[in-house]
């Protein structure tokens, strides 16, 4: 949320309240945090939702029920998942129609990717038949290091899924943007990071219309 200049400590209703049934989705949405972008905020309380959901029937579908109420109001609903494969991530995968998988160009990237793809396959088989892997995007890429080059090569050799041509580089301006409460396309629209994300957005949209 820091990317969108929303103070997570000041919002009254968040995704946590939605998941545990203490708020309404329309009340929780923060309108136009950036032009044409709405947000359902979250904060540290979200980590407690996992415990709150224990014992609830069909708890895997709670987020889907929420997004189904608003999906006709938007061109895209983007669910930003935690890196851990917990019940919140399962909820996101059950609610989604497709998954964009970011891979940091680091040593354990391939191992983590294999586990995620296995989880996605299980969710598709048991909870959400419509779920597809939209594509894989490399992030934190540094062309000066052999490690980045090796990760990209290994993933391409071992992965049958679509891989986006656009690669997100390691970029100082990208790292700075959250502290200024802005997405990179506003903070420094001419930076290599901003240009990479624009190209990725175009690639995602173009795949949708093909």
Which positions does each model-derived feature cover?
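P-loop NTP-binding core
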Residues: 1-210
């Amino acid at each position: 949320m820091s990317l969108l200049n929303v103070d997570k400590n000041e919002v009254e209703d968040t995704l946590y309240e939605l998941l545990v049934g203490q708020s309404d989705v329309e009340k929780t949405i923060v309108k136009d945090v950036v032009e044409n972008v709405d947000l359902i905020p979250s904060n540290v309380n979200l980590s407690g939702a996992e415990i709150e959901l224990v014992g609830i029937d069909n708890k895997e579908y709670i987020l889907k029920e929420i997004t189904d109420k608003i999906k006709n109001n938007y061109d895209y609903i983007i669910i930003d998942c935690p890196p851990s494969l917990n019940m919140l991530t399962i909820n996101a995968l059950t609610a989604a129609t497709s998954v964009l998988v970011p891979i940091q160009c680091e040593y354990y990237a391939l191992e983590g990717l294999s586990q995620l793809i296995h989880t996605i396959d299980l969710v598709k088989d048991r909870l959400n038949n419509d779920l597809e892997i939209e594509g894989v995007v490399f992030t934190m890429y540094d062309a000066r290091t052999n490690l980045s080059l090796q990760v990209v090569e290994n993933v391409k050799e071992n992965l049958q899924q679509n891989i986006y041509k656009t690669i997100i580089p390691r970029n100082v301006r990208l790292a700075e943007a959250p502290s200024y409460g802005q997405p990179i396309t506003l903070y420094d629209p001419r930076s290599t990071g901003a240009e990479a994300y624009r190209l990725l957005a175009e690639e995602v949209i173009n795949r949708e219309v093909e």
